[in-house]
């Protein structure tokens, strides 16, 4: 457990929690650690879950698949980030997504529903984790709304521009790395990979952006100036 202390201390779920309080809460939440090889499924659609997953090492993809196998990537989680919070907090909820190991991954599972009950001791760290959990759920809801905005665009180019604009605005820079491969980005935006690659090439030829693998530079009349929100 000690080897993962740096990750636990930076995890949003445990923000503002001291070392002693963290040890108490991990015990209270029945923390357990498991490892999964690349490509394996940690959770499958149709299952019920009672635990939140907190990634300690590696990364996971949250995906939806229809009965024909068409994939839609909803999000990606890395060290310090959580998954399955909503389903773990809602009694009887059935997963409509699967969680895949994008790489070899180590995950801590927590019985998060225990923290939703009233603590007899009125512990401040108990309340703090509830607030942190609500913050995480709100942040993920905002990200999901962003994704819906991207997918609502009519063309592949419009979806790409919506996605890149949101990333630039979030980071307040025109140059950044994205967390997806080409296939993953296509699955995230709901387009064909071949069409996405062609459109990226056209946008580069037209001087709208430049890229190398997952590194992108957006080119606008403002690119050589400070990002608008940073002025």
Residue ranges and their predicted role:
Residues 1-38, 87-90:
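Cyclic nucleotide-binding regulatory module and flanking cytosolic helices
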Residues 96-97, 117-124, 143-152, 170-173:
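Short helix-to-loop capping/linker segments positioned immediately adjacent to catalytic or ligand/cofactor-binding
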